[in-house]
Amino acid sequence: MFSIFNIWGTFNKVLFFLSLTVSLAGLVGNALLLWHLGLHIKKGPFNTYLLHLAAADFLFLSCQVGFSIATIVSGHEDTLYFPVTFLWFAVGLWLLAAFSVDCCLAYMFPSFCSPNRRPRFTSVVLCLVIWALTMPAVLLPANACGLLKNGMSLLVCLKYHWTSVTWLAVLSGMACGASKFLLIFGNCCSSQPPPKFCKLAQCSGILLFFCRLPLVVYWCLRPVLKFLLPFFFPLATLLACIDSSAKPLLYYMKGRQLRKDPLQVALNRALGEESQSGLGGLSLPMHQV
């Protein structure tokens, strides 16, 4: 019996320090990404989403590192750890859903949704609205269910919780659905290869499915999973840290053409919109017509 607890304790510590290590590496990557996206790359409707997504990932990883260090020093986990980190995680999820859907619409309806035909600050306004709406969407259920303070009302908690579960399910479905649409129709039903931002949406959707969804599931089923699968939360946290840390590397690999390409050149090639080609809508290849 004691050996089982020892194995679980060791496994938990390994996941904890892996999450801390990945978060530290991701902080450096997202800081560089924010620097280049914020100061050295011309803004457009698509890379505006990625700039805000990098900011959300940076805040998520910063909270991970801060609360992890506090846990090491104090010897116990702060009660605010989960709601605060999940707040920035949810902002990133919402931004990723908006980015994927926008890429999908621009690919399907280039005549109406292309960057040149939309109001200039549409993406900026939408990102600011997402930041503003996510805070009450996460903090109100957390407060009602006793994550921010002691004491809770079961009926009020259930009402807020199922509301948050609904919008999280919708966001996850939008992001995954849009990325899968781009993956399938962009490769099978178009005579042209998908534009670079559509490819980034495809890769981000795959990362979301494998690395972000577990933490969403934990938020939705926290009491059950905490009792039945106590290892689920640290594992989901590690996967979420991997997702937030992998995006800068993904952008760099997508933009790199030569082995010795500098970071700024690769990121500008991957995220700059001045060289973005037309999104060209869906059409069947000639040999299928």
From Swiss-Prot:
Its main location: membrane. One of its GO terms (molecular function) is G protein-coupled receptor activity. The chain crosses the membrane at residues 14-34, 53-73, 79-99, 121-141, 165-185, 200-220, 223-243. GO terms for cellular component: plasma membrane. Residues 35-52, 100-120, 186-199, 244-289 are cytoplasmic. It is found in: Cell membrane. It is a multi-pass membrane protein. Signal peptide: none annotated. InterPro entries: GPCR_Rhodpsn, MRGPCRFAMILY, MRGPCRG. Residues 1-13, 74-78, 142-164, 221-222 are extracellular. Keywords: Cell membrane, G-protein coupled receptor, Membrane, Receptor, Transducer, Transmembrane, Transmembrane helix. SUPFAM superfamilies: Family A G protein-coupled receptor-like (SSF81321). Belongs to the G-protein coupled receptor 1 family. Mas subfamily. Orphan receptor. May regulate nociceptor function and/or development, including the sensation or modulation of pain. This is Mas-related G-protein coupled receptor member G.
